[in-house]
Amino acid sequence: MKYQQGTIGRVFMAKIEHGEDLLAELKSLAVKENIRAGIMFILGAVGSASLVTGPRDCSVPPEPVWRRFTDGREILGTGTVFWDETEPVLHIHSTVGKGDLSLTGCLREQTETYLVVEAVILEISGIDASRALDPVLGVKALML
């Protein structure tokens, strides 16, 4: 295990509106406000999204299992933002549900907001963290 100690810096409250791309808006906010490290919490609803719901098996590098929906679902998620060499990289795990059906996984690609998504972002100050491709794991991993 590797770790660093930091403090909570700025706090952002964002409202992502109907039809907006949730991931693109969060990434844009990280660029605009230069959020280099942060924790985020999201809740609301999304009309469509793609999620990686786990690896096909426990191999390294993992083979992702993709799920996509377009029927509008509630969303509750948490994630982080750290930069790679050029831009912020979001890592958000969420549960989306409708009726008795739910999916849990890592949000990827375009995620269209339905009605509204509220996001709270807590900036982490005083740490030196980034994301970079881990050649062994085959994923962009947290680097401390």
Regions found by a protein language model. Give the residues of each.
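N-terminal intrinsically disordered, cationic/polar leader segments
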Residues: 1-90, 95-144
